[in-house]
């Protein structure tokens, strides 16, 4: 549905306003700003927080439930999260590998093709997502993809700094956040 709310409402309040998670299931992830924001897990462990947040919150807090975050642009910026016109809520039974592949293919299709980084980058991202979803990558290949110096990070950095428009800067987010926050889900797709 469509809901217009004031800044400052919590994620939990918005989801409750919209009727909750279908079937009363448990929250797995949220895509703030749709696929542009990637997938944020329901619970963010301290190690996943931006450094500026780690300095602000007391040391005894080890995790944050994203349902308790206030939906305000400045607050989301502190958390390095995007806050756009919509969110997608995923229950525990959602297959985020499948969802990421759908997002990557969407960006590949939506790329106008004018700039090389986006045209080639979005195609490469969709290819990697397809290889992942089809179980053609080994566990070590998947682990290499997820590193801070791996090919996905390098591609994302190149796209962000050289793409003509915003599409090229956000296209890697679904795959990057999937690899970062949901490694157990990704490993299920690894080739033996």
Where do the language-model regions lie?
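Redox cofactor-anchoring modules in respiratory/redox and cofactor-processing assemblies
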Residues: 1-192
């Amino acid at each position: 549905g469509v809901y217009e709310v004031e800044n400052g409402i919590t994620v939990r309040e918005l989801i409750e306003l919209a009727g909750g998670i279908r079937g009363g299931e448990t929250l797995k992830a949220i895509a703030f700003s749709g696929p542009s924001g990637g997938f944020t897990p329901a619970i963010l462990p301290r190690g996943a927080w931006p450094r500026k947040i780690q300095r602000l919150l007391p040391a005894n807090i080890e995790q944050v439930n994203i349902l308790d975050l206030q939906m305000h642009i400045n607050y989301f910026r502190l958390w390095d999260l995007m806050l756009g016109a919509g969110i997608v809520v995923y229950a525990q039974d959602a297959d985020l590998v499948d969802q990421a592949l759908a997002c990557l293919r969407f960006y590949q299709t939506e790329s106008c093709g004018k700039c090389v980084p986006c045209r080639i980058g979005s195609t490469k991202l969709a290819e990697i997502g397809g290889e992942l979803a089809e179980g053609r990558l080994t566990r070590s290949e998947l682990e290499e993809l997820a590193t801070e110096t791996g090919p996905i990070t390098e591609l994302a950095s190149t796209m962000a700094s050289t793409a003509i428009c915003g599409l090229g800067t956000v296209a890697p987010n679904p795959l990057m956040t999937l690899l970062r926050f949901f490694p157990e889900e990704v490993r299920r797709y690894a080739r033996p």
